[in-house]
């Protein structure tokens, strides 16, 4: 199977030079190891619908659901991984497009597990496009890189000036309750995000790169005492961003903090960034939901329902 062009470009990333050996079980990018997903949402007869759906295992979306009681017009699409996690040699592409005036929520059925590896790596390329007046919440669950894993994710965001995108990356530093060497025991975690306007004007570029043995993760201002973190981008018009920032209260308890969080402005008046760290995933998730609720209220005048019991 021919690789999606951006996936082919990922192979040349500097941090992947030491992980080019082919897996013994099945070569990298072989049929069955290239997952593809394309979702297109549009406004039809006053209702946002999933009008375009293409999927190739192990990525799967069945249909749009309308189960958000606080925002019943919102189509919700959970991404299902039928493979039970990401393996060495896997290559994923995800393309999400929200048309003019439409809205959508895309999430995952559970954590994104990056399994142990002894050869090669896994990679993912995402393209997210939100047209004029559109609204998208793309909030995948936590990524959990197992000991010895290598994962690179590249995300391109294309957002119109009057649209709103809430995009999140949340990470747990390994199976912390499984083995003492699991915490930051992965070989490589590389995640970069590039944001631009439909005309091509570049607004924001950010990259998180954690390689095995990196001493900076233990710094007091980084991850000392914490095992989970989240970076949540809110790309929205400046006036909406100002209202959100005014309402969100940073969380910096002095004694025995379970979580820390704060919001900063993105360059080029592109919106806001929430950064949160926590002891457990639910500590970070709580901070993300605080921010998410305010974003939805200010951007769409809708509330956020109570978190499901299964969470």
Swiss-Prot record:
UniProt keyword list: Chaperone, Cytoplasm, Nickel insertion
Annotated GO MF terms: nickel cation binding
Matches recorded under Pfam families: UreD
Subcellular location: Cytoplasm
Cellular compartments per GO CC: cytoplasm
InterPro entries recorded: UreD
Family assignment from sequence similarity: Belongs to the UreD family.
Description of how the protein assembles with itself and partners: UreD, UreF and UreG form a complex that acts as a GTP-hydrolysis-dependent molecular chaperone, activating the urease apoprotein by helping to assemble the nickel containing metallocenter of UreC. The UreE protein probably delivers the nickel.
HAMAP family assigned to the protein according to its UniProt record, in alphabetical order: UreD
Protein's UniProt name: Urease accessory protein UreD 2
Gene: ureD2
């Amino acid at each position: 199977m021919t690789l999606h062009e951006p996936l082919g470009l990922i192979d040349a990333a500097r941090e992947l030079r030491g992980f080019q050996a082919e897996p013994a079980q099945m070569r990298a990018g072989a049929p069955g190891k290239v997952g593809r997903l394309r979702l297109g949402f549009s406004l039809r007869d006053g209702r946002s619908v999933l009008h375009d759906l293409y999927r190739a295992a192990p990525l799967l979306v069945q249909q749009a659901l309308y189960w958000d009681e606080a925002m019943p017009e919102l189509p919700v699409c959970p991404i299902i991984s039928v493979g039970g996690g990401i393996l060495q040699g896997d290559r994923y592409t995800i393309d999400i497009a929200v048309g003019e005036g439409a809205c959508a929520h895309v999430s995952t059925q559970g954590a994104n597990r990056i399994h142990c590896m002894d050869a090669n790596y896994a990679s993912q390329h995402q393209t997210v496009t939100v047209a004029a007046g559109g609204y998208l919440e793309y909030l995948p669950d936590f990524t959990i890189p197992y000991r010895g894993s290598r994962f690179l994710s590249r995300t391109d965001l294309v957002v119109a000036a009057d649209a709103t995108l809430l995009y999140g990356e949340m990470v747990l530093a390994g199976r912390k309750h499984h083995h003492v060497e699991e915490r930051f025991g992965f070989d490589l975690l590389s995640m970069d995000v590039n944001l631009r306007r439909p005309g091509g004007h570049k607004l924001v570029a950010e990259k998180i790169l954690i390689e095995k043995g990196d001493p900076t993760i233990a710094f007091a201002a980084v991850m000392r005492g914490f095992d989970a973190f989240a970076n949540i981008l809110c790309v929205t018009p400046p006036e909406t961003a100002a209202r959100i920032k005014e309402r969100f209260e940073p969380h910096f308890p002095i004694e025995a903090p379970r979580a820390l969080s704060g919001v900063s402005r993105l360059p080029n008046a592109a919106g806001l960034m929430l950064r949160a760290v926590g002891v457990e995933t639910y500590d970070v998730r709580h901070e993300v939901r605080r921010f998410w609720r305010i974003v939805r209220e200010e951007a769409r005048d809708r509330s956020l329902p109570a978190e499901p019991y299964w969470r």
